[in-house]
Design a protein with these regions (language model features):
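Short, charged low-complexity linear segments at domain edges
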Residues: 42-62, 262-264, 301-315
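Canonical Radical SAM [4Fe-4S] cluster-binding loop centered on the CxxxCxxC motif
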Residues: 58-94, 295-297
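Radical SAM/AdoMet-radical enzyme domain recognition
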Residues: 93-113, 121-220
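A C-terminal junction/extension of Radical SAM enzymes
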Residues: 218-295, 368-371, 377-381
Length: 381
């Protein structure tokens, strides 16, 4: 496929979006929602929502963003990671570029690279720059920071929307945050809130702010380790901490919540009150072994090769893409239901084991009686 310029790609965007706009918004990229029009500037991150009679006929026909696992390779071994560590890393730079350029033509606004660790993918900086220069996409990525250097930041300067730094106990995040702030990188941090981390959350948030971080995203745990999930009491305490910190740091630092919190954080003030996380509709995950998922925690994984494959699944398999993940923590299904089901399954397995033991015991007793009967004289049992 010959590479097309931004102007050529933009000129081929869907024709059903000829909504008249104020002059100051006319240059923004257009994205159709159901009954509304979203305007987007990839360089500033500006989003403008237009809604009225002029947009009532519009329908969303593409995901707004894809989360792209460019590689399954990682330089950390986190026990709670949701990715399948046995999955292949099948993408090349050219294949990834072609797929994303075509998805941009279908209307996609953003790509967020992850993995694995994207900076272990050979030529990642080249891919970021090429996507910015030759498509209309906003390019973002999530990293643990261990392989990211100041030279890498210089190579992609002005070419990415935002980088997100994941904070772990073993990735020297304090020095990394300080470096990103010093280099004036456009960044935020991702922080997984567990019962243990909740105890020091206020201190961590204040420290991040002091180091120069202006964007903190608090994530909930998705997985089968019940000790990593917050209790109702801990969730309530977290809500209080968020409200306190948001008020104290207003104008200095934004505190955000991951979509997987769902309705657990109802008491926390929100910019938008969305009832759904958007997985499978607002965004898709593209895996390192060329499959698409509604989200990285989801059991549905459908093989694709081209952008046409992606769009065909997106438009024709809505019920699968918008279903709840089976993994505990999904906001589409109360994770308490998962634990109740898991508990029932565990109890059923224990009952089956007890029944098997009882059957073995009965058989052993019967065998014993036969042996005794044979040994006794006179045929008496």
């Amino acid at each position: 496929m010959p590479v097309q310029s931004v102007a050529e790609l933009s000129a081929q965007l869907p024709v059903e979006l000829p909504v008249e706009l104020p002059a100051q918004f006319a240059h923004l990229r257009r994205f159709a929602l159901d009954g509304a029009l979203l305007l987007f500037d990839r360089d500033t991150g500006l989003n403008v929502l237009c809604e009225g009679e002029e947009t009532a006929h519009l329908k969303q026909t593409a995901p707004r963003m894809v989360q792209f696992a460019i590689t399954n390779s990682c330089n950390l071994a986190c026990t709670f990671c949701s990715r399948d560590i046995k999955s292949n890393s099948d993408w090349t730079i050219d294949e990834a570029f072609t797929l994303l350029a075509e998805l941009s033509h279908y209307g996609l606004l953003e790509v967020a690279f992850g993995g694995g660790e994207p900076w272990t993918f050979p030529g990642f900086a080249e891919l970021v720059c090429r996507l910015y220069d030759e498509t209309s996409l906003a390019v973002n990525f999530t990293t643990n920071g261990l392989a990211l250097t100041t030279e890498d930041l210089a190579a992609i300067k002005g070419k990415y929307g935002q980088l997100r730094l994941s904070l772990y106990d073993d990735n020297d995040w304090r020095n990394m945050v300080a470096m990103l702030a010093r280099e004036k990188a456009r960044f935020g941090v991702n922080y997984l809130v567990t019962p243990e981390r909740l105890k020091t959350l206020e201190t961590t948030i204040l420290e991040l702010c002091e180091l120069g971080c202006r964007d903190i995203l608090l994530l909930s745990y998705n997985g089968y380790d019940q000790d990593m999930h917050l209790s109702k009491e801990e969730t309530s305490a977290l809500s209080g901490t968020i409200k306190l910190m948001a008020a104290a740091l207003k104008g200095r630092c934004q505190i955000k919540l991951g979509v997987c919190w769902g309705e657990q954080m109802q008491s926390v003030p929100r910019l938008f009150n969305k009832a759904d996380c958007g997985a499978g509709r607002e965004f898709l995950v593209i895996t390192s072994d060329k499959k698409i998922q509604p989200c990285s925690f989801h059991q549905v994984a459908l093989p694709v090769q081209t952008a046409a494959d992606v769009m065909n699944i997106y438009n024709k398999r809505r019920s699968e893409l918008e279903s709840a993940a089976l993994m505990p923590g999904c906001s589409r299904e109360n994770h308490a239901d998962h634990w109740a089901r898991a508990k029932r399954e565990e109890e059923e397995e224990e009952e089956e084991e007890e029944e098997e033991k009882e059957e073995e015991s009965v058989t052993a007793r019967e065998d014993g009686k036969e042996a005794i009967a044979i040994q006794r004289p006179g045929g008496q049992a």
